[in-house]
Amino acid sequence: SLLLINFVLYIIDDIRAASITMKDGGSILDWTQSFATTIDESAWLILLFLFELETYLLSDKTWNIPIFNRAMYLVRAFCYVFLAHSVYAFSMIYYDLLNVEQLINVSNLCELVPLDLSFIRNLSYSVIDAESCLNLSMENVFYYTEPNIVVTDTSGLNLEKNLALVDLLEVLVWLMILATIEVMVWLHDRSITRGIIINFIKISK
């Protein structure tokens, strides 16, 4: 239940962020990148559910039904495609943050009020208006994290970089975990309980 609650919160966060970063539209890839966390979480939740089915809940007789077997492997393949997309999306997000554009001739956030921009810090977006600009940042150097849409200051940019790197590393770690589970399921299906691979997996865990 906690996983589902967490999942719903991720969806809400992605929707809120996309309502700002994608307000001018974008390509399908841009949209999927905006919902990278939702896609990533969906894929690994489905995969974990499939592993549970295969390992503990479904009989060998059920798995030997050709149509069912193919359908399950097709779903699993799609999930891995989505996870590969997540690696790409988080990599691009991090890369873009390493190559942001600094705003020239701007030394105060309030100077940006007429431009209808948003300010981001710690993944939280705030509209820059005459009141909020006084409290959002006291720094004098600003960067576009989303060109002509979202800005942040130096400390905010460093925080966004760190968060993006954590997201990238997290999805890579989950891929390693899922690969380990795949091997365990493969060995389980063949009644292999001993050997170098089994010992290695136990040590890795």
Predicted region positions:
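Polytopic alpha-helical membrane-helix bundles and their juxtamembrane interface segments
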Residues: S1-K205
